[in-house]
Amino acid sequence: MENKYSIILGNLGNTCDRFCKSYKTNPSSERMLELAAENMPYIGGVELVGTWDIRPDNAKEMKKRLDGYGLECASIIPDTFGDSDYGKGSVSSIDPAVRRKALDYLRSMCEVALQVDCRIVNLWMAQDGYDYLLTADYDREREWMTEAIRALASEFPSLKIALEYKPKEPRNFSYHARMADTILAAQETGCRNVGVTIDTGHGFVGGENVAESIVLAKRAGDRLFHMHFNDNHGCWDDDMIVSSVHMTTYIEMMFWLRKTGYDGWLSMDQYPYREDAIGAISESLHWIKKYETIVDERYDEIERLIGLNLSLIHISEPTRQ
């Protein structure tokens, strides 16, 4: 099976944290696009972050550059996380003016997506959540989110609205935290073009088995719209190189992506703070490509082992011969 590979363009740029504002120089989006096209193996697309890479005023120019490099816009990620106006929530803010601003901004990014022939708008609603107990009306704020996402999906029926979940950061508790609550959020809109993005690292932090999450999205009505790949140690969203921690986990993921018929993008989403970005992201691409090959070559064997429910015993057999 030949999968579609992409990267988040901004991962080639500056990285920072709350202790250090800049670990690297930050190339322009145009330069990062050039670097991606010239250096990244296997990719056929890039993801663009709103305000970082793409806006209404540069959409036509960015589309021209993408076409020139033979790349697609795999998804657009609206920036509802880096604007201080959204620090206490975007479409879930208790301030109706902030909610209107956020929804209008999301509408503008959907328009941009259409301009660059992008079919996925990836919503990582990072500021929509809470930090302290007894400070949030969970029911009302979730309903505001549902209303906004429903409006967006209804107004742009040709786009897939993919909800990316993450347990925490920058808020201590996120409303889209894990597969189960995010699938519920998608279903509550009543719109078939609302689904889920799985970020492998977010799943690890949330204690999920990502392969099972893939199946849950399938069972919910083919709601898996997009995939982000990275790795971590299970306690924080470290955004490390794929397979620096997990291995069998990725083989199982790739198996279930194939078995469930997923045909979307496999996108690398890393934060190489101190590593060479081109090298780190390329390594992740090579790892995922290798796992794709393993699954292609051993698909029937893996399926048989799962069916027997004795995979650990059978995997160990070759070492005894």
Show the residue positions of the predicted features:
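Active-site-proximal loop/turn and secondary-structure-junction residues that shape catalytic pockets
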Residues: 11-13, 50-52, 79-82, 125-129, ...
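A contiguous, mid-protein "functional segment" used to position or interact
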Residues: 260-310
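N-terminal pre-domain/capping segments
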Residues: 1-108, 114, 289-316, 320
